[in-house]
């Protein structure tokens, strides 16, 4: 089983990323789900090809906005979430995941951590590592 770290909405809070530096190094995969994509630039060298990133709404029109990754036969759809209106409902996000044949969805944008299952799809939002967020994060 792979050890996966999921980050989102770091918004320049590099100290939050450094606080889990050892965990990042020990992991098999690291996903950053946007806002601010560039926060992970200085970790690229040590994480190499185990770093997967998508751009968020604060990353100003860059791509990719979403990726589909196969992890030991499990298809993971990773996106920031803003394109799917996730602050209101997860309906469009789940429909996209189904269309891609995904078993799991990783998304951010809401700054609210959650893990749930919808229509047989595991849905994970890690919350925000942003220093001023009052919402819980994993």
Q: Model-derived features: where do they sit?
A:
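N-terminal active-site segment of His-dependent metallophosphoesterases
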Residues: 1-49, 59-65, 136-138
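Beta-strand-turn-beta hairpins that frame and shape the catalytic cleft
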Residues: 1-4, 68-77, 117-123
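Active-site neighborhood of phospho(di)ester-bond hydrolases with catalytic His/Asp-centered motifs
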Residues: 6-8, 29-35, 52-57, 78-80, ...
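Short active-site segment of divalent metal-dependent hydrolases/proteases
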Residues: 12, 38, 83, 112, ...
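Generic detector of short, locally flexible boundary/turn motifs and exposed helical patches
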Residues: 15-19, 32-47, 70-71, 87-91, ...
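Short glycine/proline-enriched coil/turn segments at helix->beta-strand junctions
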Residues: 25-29, 46-50, 74, 101-102, ...
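Conserved beta-sheet core of the metallophosphoesterase superfamily
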Residues: 52, 86-138
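Helix-adjacent hinge/juxtasegments
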Residues: 52-100
């Amino acid at each position: 089983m792979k050890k996966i770290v999921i980050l989102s909405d770091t918004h320049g809070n590099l100290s939050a990323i450094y606080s889990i530096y050892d965990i990042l190094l020990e992991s098999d995969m690291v996903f950053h789900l946007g806002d601010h994509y560039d926060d992970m630039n200085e970790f690229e060298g040590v994480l190499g090809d185990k770093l997967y990133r998508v751009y968020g709404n604060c990353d100003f029109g860059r791509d990719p906005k979403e990726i589909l990754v196969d992890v030991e036969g499990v298809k993971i759809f990773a996106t920031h979430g803003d394109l799917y209106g996730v602050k209101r409902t997860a309906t469009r996000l789940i429909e996209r995941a189904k269309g891609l044949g995904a078993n799991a969805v990783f998304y951010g944008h809401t700054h609210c951590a959650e893990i749930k299952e919808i229509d047989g799809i595991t849905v994970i939002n890690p919350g925000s590592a942003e220093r001023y967020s009052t919402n819980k994060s994993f």
